[in-house]
A protein has these predicted regions:
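Short S/T/G/P-rich N-terminal loop/turn motif that feeds into the first structured element of a domain
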Residues: 1-43, 48-52, 61-68, 86-92
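Conserved short beta-strand edge segments in small beta-sheet-based binding/regulatory domains
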Residues: 75-88
Length: 92
């Protein structure tokens, strides 16, 4: 699978509120179980409830696979999906 960074820009304040409300009720275990398929796997999210964009790292076969995994949630955002073939992990 390829690495993708996705900027999910909320289409409205209401959509932003729905996103963060729903996200706050999901455990990491639930996300691990339900945000993965053979074609797309959610890896990590960076978000701030005060901002109109949230960022996600995905491993996926294609941008379409990410949108398919998101399902109806994809409609909350304008999804700017960029393949990132160069990854440098210098984490501690």
């Amino acid at each position: 699978m390829k690495d993708y960074m996705v900027a999910h820009t909320f289409k409205s304040e209401e959509h932003r509120a729905k996103h963060f409300e729903a996200s706050s009720q999901l455990t990491l275990e639930y996300m691990r179980e339900h945000m993965k398929s053979d074609n797309a796997s959610f890896q990590m999210n960076w978000g701030n409830p005060d901002e109109m964009v949230t960022y996600c790292w995905w491993k996926a076969e294609s941008p379409a696979a990410i949108l398919s995994m998101l399902g109806e949630m994809a409609e909350l955002y304008d999804n700017d999906i960029k393949e990132m073939p160069m990854v440098a992990n210098v984490a501690d």
